Amino acid sequence: MLDIIKVIILGIVEGITEWLPVSSTGHLILVGNVLKPSMSDAFMEMFDVVIQLGAIMAVVVLYFHKLNPFSPRKSHKQKMLTWQMWIKVLIASVPAGIVGVLFNDILDEIFYKPIPVAVMLIVYGILFIVVENHNAGKKPSVTRISQLSVQMLLWIGFFQMLALIPGTSRSGATIVGALLIGVSREVAAEFTFFLAIPAMFGASLLKLIQFGFHFTGAEFGLLMLGCIVSFGLSVIAIKFLMGYIKQHDFKVFGYYRIVLGGLIIVWTIIQTVIA
């Protein structure tokens, strides 16, 4: 029963933080260290990634019409635009896809620790504040996904590649990259959601293969529960973010990241001293 409660809490954390640019990994590490689930470290490492399937399904459900090139409600032109959007998503996915397959384990081994995660939280928090101050009063040059050029897509893809470092935040990194080249906040956030679909499905599949699909019945149940909770909270988080950025900038998330990074550093130092 205690593990069920812990998994529900982790699902809530994943669902809320996956789409807000605050690093779901940073939060899962912090909450995981506090809750200390009784499952094996190998299972929890896989759980932290595969639980993202629930989050990504929220994007698929919320944007199904926009993502679906076969929708009977779309004209031929609209279907072609949808296919073009998917091509853009795939182009932007190339950098992270290549580096992720080749170096994901190495990056996790080096950076999947509280202090490196905290540092990345703070670094990108500062970046959000600097970029928003730089863009203040400027009109975005890109207000539709269809306006993104190949060069822009690879630039955004480069920032998604940087998000392979835990604590960076996939949504945070790609949004910062998009804002730097004049993309509007709404388009930056929406394209980030779409870009996450192949990245998160791929990462989850890779972890499942590495884990060998060797679940006990209890572990499979906990994984499904985490995904379901993550899905529900992700729907709420996505709707909140898209509504919020219509009236506000991303600086509040920058300040939050800096505070959270500082708290993780303090918490880690305290844990080290106590140990």
PLM regions with names:
Residues 1-275:
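Multi-pass membrane proteins that catalyze or facilitate reactions on polyprenyl-/lipid-phosphate substrates
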